[in-house]
Amino acid sequence: MNYSQLKPARLNLGWSQQQAAAHLGVTQAYLSMMERGLRSPASVAPRLMKVYGLSPTVLPVNEVRDEVSADTLAHELALLGYPGYAHLRKGGQAGNPASFLLTALGQRNLEARTAEGLPWVVLKYPDMDSTFLVREARTRNLQNRLGFTVTLGRRAANRSDLQPLEQQLVDSKLEKEDAFCKELNSAERKWLQGHSSAEARAWNLLSDLTPSSVRYV
């Protein structure tokens, strides 16, 4: 979380430091130091998000997980506000969307409805830490999957603000053919080799997802 967000968020609520500190459960002196960048807000980030009404992008990025159940990922996407999973939103707190996105993209077999929701995450949270996203995607060889996700979102909503992130991923695109979050049998692979979308082929991926597949834009 960038400390420079704190003072504008407080002032937007019309609160003095003393009032905000009381809502946050910290001292005025501690809040003052956080607003000046002298103390890290990471330990109170969830409280800041709730009290100030900030985006979950302010939360610390968590470790990218390798194997996560389909139900867990669906619930986490619901907590981020995905309309398609509104019925799963009860219980729990949203995590950092960048951590969720990379975790989902790294799954060997991601549930199709969850995969369709990933471009929505990119559109909903354009302020995700792009440095973290690109670095971790490259580390895990996920840049093509992430790039495809960004392309789908950008074209579905005509969002030029996503082009810088997309270009960073283009610059490190992998040449090896991959499937989008799904292990394919030989019949599925053969079919998708002839029916993958232009956007997927541009990222050397096998997938029939298109910008028109992106919902809730």
For each predicted feature, which ranges?
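Residues within the helices of the helix-turn-helix
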Residues: K7-P8, Q18, A29-S32, P46
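Helix-turn-helix/homeodomain-like alpha-helical modules used for DNA recognition
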Residues: V64-D127
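Charge-dense, extended regions
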Residues: L162-V217
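An accessory alpha-helical subdomain
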Residues: V121-V122, L133-N141
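Short basic helix-loop element that most often maps to the first helix and adjoining turn
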Residues: S4-H23
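DNA major-groove recognition helix of helix-turn-helix/homeodomain DNA-binding modules
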Residues: A42-P60
